[in-house]
Structure formats: C-alpha cells, structure tokens
Amino acid sequence: MTNPEGRCYHGLMVHVDTPPVHKGTDSPETPLAVSTWSGQAREQAVQRMFTSIAGVYDLNNTLLSFGLHYRWKKITASYVPVITAGRALDVGSGTADLALLVEPRMGINGRVIASDLNHAMLVEGLKKVTGRGLGKKITCLEANAEHLGFPDGTFNAVTTGFCMRNVGNLRQALMDIHRILQPGGRFVCLEFSRPIFGWLRTLYDWYSFRLLPWVGTKVAHDTTGVYEYLPASIRNFPDQERLKQMLLDAGFRQVTYRNLSGGIVAIHVATK
C-alpha cells in the first residue's frame, strides 16, 4: 500500500515526518511535571515511559481497569460505520486492540493502519496482528499523531483509544485527523474523562493517585513513574464538553459523546 508521496506501508516501518516543536516547561522530568508539558519534551518523556511497560501493557490494562477496557473498546469500534473496501486509521494504536476490532468493519477488501509513535508498543501490536493472520489487512506503522503524513482525505474512518491525552499538541493532532478524513468521514475517540458523579470522582481520584501507581509498579516493576504520569495526564485532559468544543474548533461537525462507566471514560464521535 502506498500513498502519493511514495511511502510504502507494509509490516512495521518507521515514518519520520516530525517538525521541530518546543519544550513547554523547564521543570525537571517528574511524572506529574511531564503531564503538563507540551511539544517534543513531553513526547520524548512519554515515549520512554511506554517503552518501559510495552511488554506488560495489556496485562496491566486488564488488571487496572478490572477488564473494562475490553468492553470500552468494543463499544468504541461499534461507532465505526461498516464500509465496503474501507480505509481506517487507528491513531496511537499501541498494542492494536482497537485496530483489530475496526478491521472487520472495513469489508473484505478493506485496510486498517495501526499507527503509534512508540516502536516497542507497535511490536506488541504486530504480534497480535500476525498471530491472527491479518498481516495483509492491518499495517503497523510508526507515526506522530500531530503530523501523520497522509494525503488529505485518505481515510473513511479514524479511531483512537487512550492516546489523545499523551500528545504534545492536542489541537494540532485533531486538525491533522480532520485533514486526513474524507468528507463525511468519522472520527471516534475513546479517552479517559471526568466522572459525572461526585462520589465517583472522589473514589476514582483515590484509586488513580493512590492505588494505581502502587499496583502498576508492583506488576510492571517500573521505575519511570508512568503510573504516576497516567492519572496526572487524565486530570489535565479536557473534560467531555471541552473536548467536544475542541473537535468543533478543529472543523468537525455533528460532535456527540457518550459516557461509559459513569464518565470514567467517554467516546466522542465527530463527522467531517
């Protein structure tokens, strides 16, 4: 599969199309500080964290979400329209769970690209893709969510799951996703959000900032602080209404969202 610029998308490849960006703060690299950074500094710090946990990422997701992440992803994929010979992109695909769920919705001649900036995470995703015999249907590709490098109007659908809060420039990422969608194409975004009940917010904060770092570190034996960064990044991410407005500002229309698990996560659906 190639694009008009001549890039070939087969197997796990490296896509380099990242212009210079600026460090958002001069703070020392601590997990809580990184969650407020922007640009290249944030990107590099986040990549180090995810590289350290790539091999246990799926296990940790299951343990830390009590298995709910599977349900959340299945519901997210259900918002992707069924298309004959469709083309879909999963941004920040990580270990490719969402890409695998989207693939059947693209039809027998459809293709899905699972993109992520982190090589180690994509290696884990590629194992799943090839293990299911889908190497010709799903391509794993290293790409920056802010500068995806595809021509305008390439995809019928773009999905993302738990990626957007990790990008250095969220507005830029949303605009680039809008650019590469075909007119009428759909963007489906699954991300952690703000619980809608006060008691749930209190419980969720205790779990996120107290229990999650302890459990994550014990399971992953991680020393990078990623399990402190993750809840901090969730707290600093736009809530349901703010993200909806950002999608509208990026040029999307008919933007709606659905809360799952009391607003712990939300699915935003936007049409170009």
Region spans (language model):
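N-terminal auxiliary segments of SAM/dcSAM-dependent transferases
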Residues: 13-48
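A short glycine-rich, Lys/Arg-flanked "PGG" loop and its adjoining helix->strand segment in the class I
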Residues: 171-183
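Conserved alpha-helix/loop element of class I SAM-dependent methyltransferases that forms part
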Residues: 63-86, 101
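A short SAM/SAH-binding and catalytic strip from SAM-dependent methyltransferases
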Residues: 156-170
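Conserved class I S-adenosyl-L-methionine
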Residues: 186-215
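Core SAM-dependent methyltransferase catalytic element
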Residues: 250-272
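A short acidic, Gly/Pro-enriched loop at the edge of an enzyme's catalytic core
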Residues: 146-157
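Class I SAM-dependent methyltransferase SAM/SAH-binding core
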Residues: 87-147
